[in-house]
Regions:
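Core segments of alpha-helical transmembrane spans in multipass integral membrane proteins
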Residues: 34, 61-84, 100-105
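Membrane-water interface at the C-terminal end of transmembrane alpha helices
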Residues: 132-155
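Cytosolic juxtamembrane helix and N-cap/initiation of the first transmembrane helix
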Residues: 2-35
């Protein structure tokens, strides 16, 4: 005898790699979305941060403010994207793979830019390696989750 109720899709437990990937995306999003503060930060504060980092006086003119605000806005957008991707890492898997690979390429560009621009050694030693760590973790977890998903469907 069949049930008169419609069939519901079985809910499989979320694999550990997918849960970990979602958390990495959330933490990445939480960190990068804070760049939104710099979009609205007074220029005087930007100058103070510039000096505090040992970079001397901030340059005068609109280009410094424009670049600081637009780069900060892009980081904040990236943070929002990470939050969205964390809501369904299986469905957004291909996008997560793209973002992780793009971030790895971005880390290489950051390293070159940081060195060429003469950024402080501590900055150079932290920025690009941090991006490599987070994006590498994202990519590794995505690969593990995808492999486990493939193994589960082949059973």
């Amino acid at each position: 005898m069949t049930s008169p109720l419609p069939r519901t899709r079985e809910r499989r437990p979320v694999p550990r790699a997918e849960r970990a990937l979602a958390w990495v995306l959330r933490v990445n999003g939480a960190v990068t979305v804070t760049a939104l503060l710099a979009v609205f930060m007074p220029v005087g504060w930007m100058g103070a941060v510039h000096a505090r980092l040992g970079l001397g006086a901030a340059p005068d003119g609109p280009m410094f403010e424009y670049l600081a605000r637009t780069v900060s806005a892009l980081y904040a957008i990236h943070g929002g994207l990470c939050f969205v991707l964390s809501t369904d890492v299986r469905r957004f898997g291909p996008v997560i793979t793209y973002v992780a690979c793009a971030e790895l390429a971005f880390a290489a560009a950051l390293l070159l830019i940081d060195v060429k621009a003469g950024m402080p050694a501590a900055w150079v030693m932290v920025e690009a390696p941090a991006v490599v760590f987070v994006s590498g973790l994202m990519l590794g977890l995505r690969i593990v989750a995808r492999r486990r998903e493939r193994d589960a469907t082949s059973d």
